[in-house]
Amino acid sequence: LPAFRPAAEVAAFGWLRKEAAGGEVVLAAYQTSNALPAWTPVRVVAGHGPETPGLAELTPRVEGFFDVLTTAEARLALLKAEQVDYLFYGPAERTLGGWDPTSWECLRPAYASGAYAIYSTCMGSDA
């Protein structure tokens, strides 16, 4: 990971730090998830290697979530299994398959700025 984070990404992390309750779960690409808990009180599905039980099994599921060919049912199954409250969507997530989260009914826009968006999920505590 780079020694710095893009300003727009840091701003998105800041939004989560203010809005997410401690312990809420965020789904994001590994690259994002590895940094996110250092900036916010959230948990991530697959992040810092030694602190993610089952990382080898979770990584392909997380990557597949963002693949355009993945079904809505498979996405929903991951959200349920991991009790995901928020989806983080930025450049790292876009590289995983080109899926566009804006049209999925299980997501509600919560934050958007530049190349970064955060969605609350239909699994979230306020759903």
Question: Residue locations for each model-derived region?
Answer:
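Extracytoplasmic
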Residues: 1-127
